[in-house]
């Protein structure tokens, strides 16, 4: 599935969670990279929500961390046909349903010169 979406500013909470060893070590082991401590937030059209929710609900990749932290489902993905990473689905989130959170080894706003309002494609 390939979806175009719009880059938006997140809440800034992912940096803390993606700095925790149990998340970092799991992503490194299972996705092949140490994630940059932050996500690229992408708003996708609501028409894709049924397919996204199906993927999320059927996802078997899950990190179950220490007590006090939420579980995270993830699927490997590509951004703009050039960056390999993953989409994360945190069990505890305050984002709307049509937000995708993309992680990669680099700070994607800098690497791809992205700003709020830019269009990106996410494939998973």
From Swiss-Prot:
Pathway(s) of this molecule: Cofactor biosynthesis; FMN biosynthesis; FMN from riboflavin (CTP route): step 1/1
Gene Ontology terms, MF aspect: magnesium ion binding; nucleotide binding; riboflavin kinase activity
Reactions mediated catalytically: riboflavin + CTP = CDP + FMN + H(+)
Disulfide cysteine pairs (residue numbers): none
Highest taxon of the lineage: Archaea
Record keywords: Flavoprotein, FMN, Kinase, Magnesium, Metal-binding, Nucleotide-binding, Transferase
Residues involved in CDP binding: 10-15, 106-109
Annotated Mg(2+) binding sites: 39, 41
Cofactor(s) named in the record: Mg(2+)
Biological processes, Gene Ontology terms: FMN biosynthetic process; riboflavin biosynthetic process
Gene3D superfamilies noted in UniProt: Riboflavin kinase-like
Cofactor: how and how many bound: Binds 1 Mg(2+) ion per subunit.
Pfam families: CTP-dep_RFKase
PANTHER family attached to this UniProt entry: RIBOFLAVIN KINASE
Similarity comment: Belongs to the archaeal riboflavin kinase family.
Name of this chain's protein: Riboflavin kinase
Lineage: Archaea, Methanobacteriati, Methanobacteriota, Methanomada group, Methanobacteria
Gene transcribed to yield this protein: ribK
